[in-house]
């Protein structure tokens, strides 16, 4: 393979000279592709120890990582990565590998013949084939896009291993770049000079300087960056600087793995300054202590939101992954910093900007904004990054604000956009995907492939003057045959049928998989056009438009605001998860909007079951759900809970409301009456505080001390006295006439 060896050597030499990466595509038969990869790596002067192969490992002599474990490579850098795309072309894996190649390195793709690739079905296509669809129903539009962009972009060499022909050498012949100026320690810095010495770019040094604002209270810092800019590292340098000054730094992130870079840099700085107090300063530990008495510690978001031990500084890494409710808790800290990824390989974070900025600006913190654009591992303008951003739509954005800022729902046109239409119109595709990226942190490259190729996925949108203002991603679910339903009921997993799966496996309703439904996976409205009714208009259009469907549904992390939105649009709650989401700390709710008799029957029985069981769950697995979430969930249940109180139980409730009887004598009837009111009663009968009291004390059974503290009663006696107040109007509204004489005895 002399032609390949020469091309690989030239490609690697240019990559090293420019501190950029280059991409080498080896197209053709798989075994020949692996041989070509080894030859190219050798010709490029890269040692085997500096290479990771991603795939099954067959035919290679490099360290191998399964394609399903590419998350283990995040945060590492390699001189070369060989990604085998024959068994599966997984978009997330592709994006992650782009981010893991160091400047001067090579990303090698071993792929089928380019003209055939899109027409082949692989393991990822099996993943997209959601039952009852099969892999033959999956399309190849995403791989068609990959092939087209590989052929169009600079810095990408293409070699046909079957014909042993070089189709493109991938060389760009760039002009030499001037050396960047040295990084200097700013005058008057509060941080150690060693922290600035550890910065790799001017952007990092500027961000570190901004983080010095956290030396005084009532300051906040927001750092936004594309992936690979070193924002987590600079947060770690700041954390270490505060810790060596004796301060307590609380770090939180979606997972500890996400925050490893923070702890690694903090550990390195403290070691350089000889300030580590013990062996807990290892980068894998969750607490780092310094000789000055300071520390850097990690807590998961739900625990961190309580600000345990009153930290001096809070650092929130990958903030866009967390809900606004959690961020609001962090604003109680005197000093807080948020870092967030704008264009990421496993999720993007403009939603943080959309959802939280107003609250941050209204807080008592002076906010310092920082944007980091300079890569730390390769040169700016790196052609492989440019290709990945375009091919995977990592930089997709909605229309610029002025184009939609005056739009109204009445002037919008409704469109059902097919995948072929999206592929044919790059502008429309970028705006559509950009809105999903902006509104949902976990929108990732796999979602682009799902949007283009999955047979159960469809898109609906509202457009104004040709620009996407609101978009919904829909997933067709259900319609499962008896054999599949039986398997799921007995414990088998099923892809892509979230609502039928929950109803069949968790709630033991085997028949729930038979009706056909459409789940609204995601709905997003342009930030400049929110709170005007676009989302409601879009849902109404979808309801009128879908055919052959028994129900519409949705599932999401429950908040009072979202619950009210979906309930206003006709969706009723039928299930609340019994565990919190580990990242967001929220409980997930499932809601249905029935469209046919079959859908009505499904909705009616699950709404009734939910209303019947939720009171018991509140005393157990749902005991720590926020009272306002409970109120909103129950208000969204379309059912009539049974009010089967005996005459003696009614006399107890009436006597506690109007006379000397005690709630503690038998809490059961009080709970059933509370459920009835919260599900089907007039919401104007009780104040929000009175309803919270019912939830906290009567349904969840918290101690009177906890209730008094949470609801701001002056003491436990006041809280217990207040418990009688909401039951008076409830007795008046629900008690049968033959027990009202009990009320009349006390001069009501």
Locations of regions flagged by a protein language model:
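Conserved coupling/interface region of RecA-like P-loop/ASCE motor cores
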Residues: 133-202, 206, 358-401
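Hydrophobic positions on the alpha1 helix immediately C-terminal to the Walker A/P-loop
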Residues: 36, 234, 238, 538
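N-terminal pre-P-loop "Q-motif" helix
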Residues: 2-11, 196-219, 689
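Conserved RecA-like ASCE ATPase "motif II neighborhood" in helicase/translocase motors
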Residues: 62-96, 292-332
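N-terminal accessory nucleic-acid engagement/regulatory domains that precede
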Residues: 71-81, 85-178
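Inter-Walker segment of RecA-like/P-loop motor cores
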Residues: 57-79, 254-305
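Conserved beta-hairpin
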Residues: 446, 456-474, 479
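Terminal substrate-recognition subdomain of acyl/acetyltransferases
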Residues: 267, 271-292, 302, 313, ...
